Amino acid sequence: MKIRRLFKYHSLKKKPIRPTWNKYNLYNLATAGREPRISGKTFFQQKWLAKSLTRAYHGEHIKERKWARMFSRRLPAVVNMDPAYMAKYNGSEQAAGRGSGLSEPPAYEKTADEKPAKQVIANPGRKVPTPYEQMTFAPLERRLDIAIFRALFASSARQARQMVVHGAVTVNGKKMKHPGYLLNPGDLFQVDVERVLYATGAPKDKKLLAAAMKAAKKELAEEAQEAAEEKDAEAEEAEEGEAQEAASKSGKKEKQVDTSKFDEAWNRKYELLQLQRLLQYAKHIADSPSHQLSATRKQALRALKRDIKAAIKQAQRRDGSVSPTGNVVDDLTMLLERLAVSPSKAIQQEEAAKELSKKLDKQSRQVLKKVIEYNDEHEDNEIDPSKPYMTPWRPRNYMSAFAFIPRYLEVNQNICAAVYLRHPVARPGESEVPSPFSPTINQLAFNWYLRRG
């Protein structure tokens, strides 16, 4: 897209209606008012105006010559027939005329005693006119990107096209990277759930997103550092094992070896193992949902994890000049036990909660029950700073004005999949092709493409 076009895409002066959920587009749609005046213009000018208005909404990202090849002058429609009417009549009454005696005779032949003739019965299903003009852009509804936008999996037709091009869409179980693919009745298309959550969810604040990215990078760096330290420790253990094997194979007892160094290395290794177990236990406490820690305890637990990591680094030094003593390990163990909640304390807390629930009145119990049900329903929708959209997830602003699904699509929002049931058709009084324009505008647009179809 050209940079110049970005400023005119949602022009508040010309007010073009676009296939997006943008707030400026909603403003243009709400303030559009009545249709532009076409009286006083030539027929060519009327058709040109209608074409420019409708093409801004229907397939505006598709080239004009490509749409001209897709255009079809056949407008699909169906007629609702009344079963009672079809069972009573066979259609001959529609062709009955004066020869059958069903029409009234001329006024000069009537007499005073003559009764009025029987009137021809019309089909009740044809009382409402069928808007054939609204089906002008029906061929575009078969496109994969337009179907994704109609199924509410994307906030605009261009975003739906981007999903297809980036390989986030499958048709009948196979990846489809062509946004212009024409769906057939019965085709199943599915979009990646994360892409749909990002496209239809509320955007995250830029400051929060930057902070989340910084925290994620820091966490990845810490994990990489821990993996490197574990790898170094394993390499040291392997070297010590090889040295011991070589010494045992030699079988030479030239001198009595001083075992103080080996004892020191063994003690350092034992303390390192204790520290690693402490670190695992601290991580278990932080990640376990059964340990309900307050904010201050969480801060203390983070500081403790940093101290344990620092002690591990000191214990892993080969020279052994600075090694943690047993007192450090004991102090860290005692501090960790203070932070953790023992099972007996957890049982006591549960019993206290039960006693408190007995003391609550009926209204408070109902409120508490609703809160618990809400938490159970939104258990999976938790705060996740790593996501690029707002968490807990909520729909995009101003989405309700565009939240409708055509009848020719069967959508399952849980798995972000939809079935293209059939081609859209026009019925008496309604059209299955969504359009913000009146039949008059669509009729003029149809006449514009009629000589080119």
Curated annotation (Swiss-Prot):
InterPro entries cross-referenced by the UniProt entry: Ribosomal_uS4, Ribosomal_uS4_CS, S4_RNA-bd, S4_RNA-bd_sf
GO molecular-function terms, A-Z: rRNA binding; structural constituent of ribosome
Stretch forming the signal peptide: none
One GO cellular component term: mitochondrial small ribosomal subunit
UniProt superkingdom: Eukaryota
Record has Transmembrane helix as a keyword: no
Segments of skewed composition (Acidic residues): 222-243
Short name of one Pfam family: S4
Localization of this protein: Mitochondrion
Keyword rRNA-binding among record annotations: yes
UniProt region (Disordered), positions on chain: 94-115, 221-259
Biological process terms in GO annotation: ribosomal small subunit biogenesis
Keywords: Mitochondrion, Ribonucleoprotein, Ribosomal protein, RNA-binding, rRNA-binding
Record function comment: Component of the mitochondrial ribosome (mitoribosome), a dedicated translation machinery responsible for the synthesis of mitochondrial genome-encoded proteins, including at least some of the essential transmembrane subunits of the mitochondrial respiratory chain. The mitoribosomes are attached to the mitochondrial inner membrane and translation products are cotranslationally integrated into the membrane.
Membership in a protein family: Belongs to the universal ribosomal protein uS4 family.
Subunit annotation: Component of the mitochondrial small ribosomal subunit (mt-SSU). Mature N.crassa 74S mitochondrial ribosomes consist of a small (37S) and a large (54S) subunit. The 37S small subunit contains a 16S ribosomal RNA (16S mt-rRNA) and 32 different proteins. The 54S large subunit contains a 23S rRNA (23S mt-rRNA) and 42 different proteins. uS3m, uS4m and uS5m form the narrow entry site of the mRNA channel.
Protein name (Swiss-Prot/TrEMBL): Small ribosomal subunit protein uS4m
Protein encoded by which gene: NAM9
